[in-house]
Amino acid sequence: MADIKQFGLDLGIYGPLAEPEIVINLAKYAETAGFSSIWLADHVVFPKHFDSKYPYSATGGFPAPIEDPLLEPIATMAVLAGSTTDIRIGTAVLIIPYRNPVLLARMLITIDQFSGGRITLGAGVGWLKEEFETLNTADFALRGRVTDEYLEIFKSLCSGQEVSYHGETYQFDTVYSVPGSIQKPNPPILIGGIANPALRRVIKYGDGWLAVALDPIRMKERIETLKKLCVDSGRRFEDLELVYKIFINPGEPKKGPFGEREIGSGSEVQIIDDLKNILGSGFNNVVVRYRGDSAKEQQKQMERFTEEIIPKL
């Protein structure tokens, strides 16, 4: 049987339930129930009009109304660090190019300090070009290279020592970064994404991989690719933390980006089979997200997950 410590909970900080009291209460529930971690997605603003395609849906449309409430994840992490005591707090994922890399690193280091070393950085390159343009912090076309360099900067500033950096997209002369992060050499970095560049980024910069929206066939193929990259680079696959983020949608099955049934949608039996397959494929942790229409409904769904679904895994 699966252990609840194999599961994290995405708190849903965009959508109708993105309210401070609801988010804090759900975080406290997750800690009391025994979940290993709580997770936050990242958008700063949604442009009213955009042509960018969401990469994890069959239609390319974003799966939530863009005019719904939206909370910023780093500020929310700081609040949750003070509202909880033991549970880990992660981003799934933080869009690295959205923020100045030095300020981003210092904010995350500060939260790591206040939380007693409980943060995990799930890192992604982003997909919403129009949001990049609104924030005006990085060129969308260069987001992969920018992410790589910003992760290098993050790691160096976590050292708590004198740091300088001179890359292609960002440079600074020697600064003091004191204190460094509690977690050494830095808080764990999980690279989000399922394409080959993301897997290569896992090998070069990550402590693990954060996957989403993979059907069983592609899941197996992506893991085999990651194993091969580990062999080629001399890294141990067994040392990587593998995390899968799943949206739970009970009821009528939904279509995934390739027309297949979306993982996590359908009947209870189908959802249980999906979770068994994910855990059986080698993932260490599963981050679940229920979309409820109310705080009461979301709480009910999570109680059912912990009391009825997990014991069947």
Describe the residue ranges of each PLM region.
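Active-site-adjacent structural elements that line small-molecule/cofactor binding pockets in enzymes
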Residues: M1-L313
